[in-house]
C-alpha cells in the first residue's frame, strides 16, 4: 500500500469552507410576507384573545425614527408595560448609531 504524504491541507479546508458557506446561505433564507394593516390588526386581536386568561395584552407601536414596529406586553389591571420586544432602548440606540454614522456617510437619495 502506497500512502502519499499530504503537503498541504488547503484542498480539504477549501471544501470544508465551501460546505459551511452553502449551509449558512440556506439557513438565512426566510420567506417574506406582505401583511396589510387590517390583517395585522386581526392577528393582534386574535393574540389578545389568546392572552386573555393571563391578564395581559399586546400593543404594537411604531418607532418614530426607525419607522419599524415593536411590541409592548401590557398588564391589563395596572396598564403597566411588562416587556417590550425588541426593547425600545435598543431601538433608540440603533437609531442614534445610524444617525451618527449618517453624519460621516453621504447618502444619495
Curated annotation (Swiss-Prot):
InterPro entries registered for this protein in UniProt: FlaG, FlaG-like_sf
SUPFAM superfamilies, sorted: FlaG-like (SSF160214)
UniProt superkingdom: Bacteria
NCBIfam families on file: PRK07738.1
Protein name: Uncharacterized protein YvyC
Source organism (scientific name): Bacillus subtilis (strain 168)
Gene name, Swiss-Prot/TrEMBL: yvyC
Amino acid at each position: 500500500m502506497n500512502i502519499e504524504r499530504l503537503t498541504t491541507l488547503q484542498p480539504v479546508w477549501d471544501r470544508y469552507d465551501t460546505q459551511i458557506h452553502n449551509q449558512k446561505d440556506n439557513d438565512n433564507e426566510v420567506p417574506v410576507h406582505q401583511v396589510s394593516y387590517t390583517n395585522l390588526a386581526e392577528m393582534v386581536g386574535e393574540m389578545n384573545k389568546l392572552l386573555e386568561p393571563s391578564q395581559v395584552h399586546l400593543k404594537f407601536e411604531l418607532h418614530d425614527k426607525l419607522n419599524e414596529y415593536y411590541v409592548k406586553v401590557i398588564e391589563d389591571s395596572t396598564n403597566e408595560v411588562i416587556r417590550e420586544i425588541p426593547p425600545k432602548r435598543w431601538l433608540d440606540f440603533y437609531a442614534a448609531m445610524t444617525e451618527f454614522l449618517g453624519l460621516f456617510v453621504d447618502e444619495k437619495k
